[in-house]
């Protein structure tokens, strides 16, 4: 029972701790099967909150565009983006990623980019996830993202993760054992 819902929900890559193209992965990342069609969002179960997050497939959750916690997380990430840039400028070690909206086949998903550098108001990097809304883009593909389009950021140091505000919201959808494992990694 899958149904496309126009505009009401947004897909979020849920890769706790951040995917890493250079090998330092915290364990929950898996390649996602893609097709030329957009991912379908399941209907709410009978009696369930119609605005509640919905698992689409492994590591992909759909959040309603009016989800207050997710929108607050994106706002906090945007407000603290200068801290991310300062960590980069100061040479703080770690894997740097930013989340941004990626549109293909008329569908938008929110996906991570592993940062390689900055070019003015743009961030250079490589897709850290396999997109689910088509095959135009591939994990590892080089891209540039406008700083204004960044919805979240993370610096993953293995034993500590800075930022990751949307990932923190997504933790609420994980089983308790997994959630506890990742919650202790996040720092402000």
What kind of region is each of these model predictions?
Residues 2-112, 116-188:
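Mixed-charge, low-complexity intrinsically disordered regions
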């Amino acid at each position: 029972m899958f149904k496309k819902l126009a505009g009401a929900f947004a897909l979020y890559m849920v890769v706790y701790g951040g995917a890493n193209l250079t090998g330092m992965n915290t364990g929950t990342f898996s390649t996602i099967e893609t097709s030329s069609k957009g991912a379908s969002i399941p209907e709410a179960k009978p009696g369930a909150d119609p605005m509640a997050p919905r698992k689409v497939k492994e590591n992909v959750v759909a959040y309603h565009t009016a989800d207050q916690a997710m929108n607050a997380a994106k706002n906090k990430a945007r407000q603290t983006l200068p801290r991310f840039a300062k960590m980069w400028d100061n040479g703080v070690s770690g894997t740097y990623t930013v989340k941004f909206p990626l549109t293909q086949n008329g569908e938008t998903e929110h996906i991570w980019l592993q940062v390689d550098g900055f070019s003015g108001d743009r961030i250079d990097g490589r897709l850290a996830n396999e997109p689910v809304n088509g095959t135009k883009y591939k994990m590892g593909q080089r891209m540039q993202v406008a700083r204004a389009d960044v919805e979240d950021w993370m610096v993953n140091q293995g034993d500590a993760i800075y930022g990751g505000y949307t990932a923190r919201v997504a933790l609420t959808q994980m089983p308790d054992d997994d959630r506890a494992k990742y919650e202790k990694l996040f720092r402000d």
